């Protein structure tokens, strides 16, 4: 399942310059994936679309994929949107433009589910975790204390609060999630 990301309080909600549209032709991109923003498209129909690549190193000035989680169900050549209400089944399809935002250190709060983290490196698995740092492979790992003079995208674990995910019935499913404060980008 894909990560669920909620923009709890982010500057990109008020500053348009922190929002862009990206496209990655090689693979699907989950929301919350750290991205390197490349060059602007030369296609006249997509002049505000930037090529992106998933982060593959500890780096700053990264963007996070974040599109409305409307799941697309494909049947042959037909595409149906909104039949599946579970945002964990959503992904940004390869080769199609998607939204992204640039986290601002000291301001932004995001909420993410367990799938945001590298396998076995979520805050529940890492006892005493207080920070989350991007790794050389672009994944995020919870760590007990911040790395001294860390040079990449980093978050402080602010709180653990569940996200209620609709499942097509009355009520919903409570899913573990963490609110993260951006401390470095």
Across the structure, where does each feature detected by a protein language model lie?
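Surface-exposed, low-hydrophobicity beta-strand/loop segments enriched in small/polar/acidic residues
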Residues: 1-185
């Amino acid at each position: 399942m894909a990560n669920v990301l909620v923009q709890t309080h982010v500057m990109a909600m008020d500053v348009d310059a922190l929002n862009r549209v990206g496209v990655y032709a090689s693979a699907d991109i989950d929301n919350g994936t750290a991205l390197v923003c490349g060059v602007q498209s030369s296609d006249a129909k997509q002049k505000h679309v930037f090529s992106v690549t998933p982060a593959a190193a500890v780096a700053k000035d990264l963007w996070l994929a974040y599109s409305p989680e409307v799941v697309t169900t494909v049947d042959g050549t037909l595409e149906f949107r909104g039949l599946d209400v579970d945002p964990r089944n959503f992904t940004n399809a390869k080769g199609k433009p998607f939204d992204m935002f640039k986290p601002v250190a000291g301001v932004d709060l995001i909420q993410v589910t367990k799938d945001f983290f590298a396998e076995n490196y979520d805050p529940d698995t890492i006892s005493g975790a207080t920070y989350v740092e991007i790794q050389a492979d672009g994944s995020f790992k919870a760590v007990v204390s911040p790395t001294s003079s860390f040079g990449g995208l980093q978050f402080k674990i602010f709180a653990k609060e569940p996200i209620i995910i609709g499942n097509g019935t009355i009520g919903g499913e409570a899913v573990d999630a963490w609110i993260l404060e951006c401390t470095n980008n």
